């Protein structure tokens, strides 16, 4: 199984179960920016406990590793759980939607795209991908997040609402990171 096969399968599974979701993280940043290798899919989802059995049927233990108790705990505590495809080494990080202004806003700004022939996918807006990548950089200082952001700004820069990014960077205490990224972009040109 290839990454985009798993994206397609995940999307079809979630949509069949009526799970609200959007793809974010590296898969989204690659869509808006430059290609790079990734073996994981980040998806934010609104999953109810009543949907767990259906979810597990779509990801049977013969092919996937999904721990039911971890799923249940993630839903109750608004955390994340993994779906792993051991044969390919691919992993899905399912991040349970939090009830806060930013997550609520992200769900309102979902883009519906067709990156895979014959499949429509809900994907995070580029601005929200940038904001989350800044947040992850602040938490762990991995340069890949900065590279992803600069790539997105170079490729999709004209279509990115920088005012929106600035507003949330201010609210989420990411202003200094955003300013440093903008200075880096200007010095690269």
Located regions from the model:
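Compositionally biased terminal segments of proteins
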Residues: 1-189
């Amino acid at each position: 199984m290839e990454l985009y096969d798993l994206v397609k399968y995940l999307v079809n599974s979630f949509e069949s179960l009526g799970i609200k979701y959007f793809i974010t993280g590296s898969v989204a940043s690659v869509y808006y920016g430059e290609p790079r290798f990734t073996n994981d899919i980040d998806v934010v989802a609104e999953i109810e406990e009543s949907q767990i059995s259906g979810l597990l049927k779509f990801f049977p233990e013969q092919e996937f590793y999904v721990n039911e108790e971890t799923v249940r705990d993630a839903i109750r505590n608004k955390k994340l759980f993994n779906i792993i495809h051991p044969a390919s080494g691919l992993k899905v990080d399912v991040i349970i939607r939090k009830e806060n202004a930013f997550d609520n806003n992200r769900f309102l700004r979902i883009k519906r795209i067709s990156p895979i022939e014959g499949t429509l996918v809900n994907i995070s807006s580029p601005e929200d991908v940038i904001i989350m990548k800044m947040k992850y950089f602040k938490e762990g200082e991995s340069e890949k997040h900065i590279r992803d952001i600069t790539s997105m700004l170079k490729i999709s820069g004209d279509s990115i609402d920088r005012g929106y990014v600035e507003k949330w960077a201010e609210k989420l205490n990411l202003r200094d990171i955003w300013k440093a990224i903008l200075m880096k972009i200007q010095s690269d040109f």
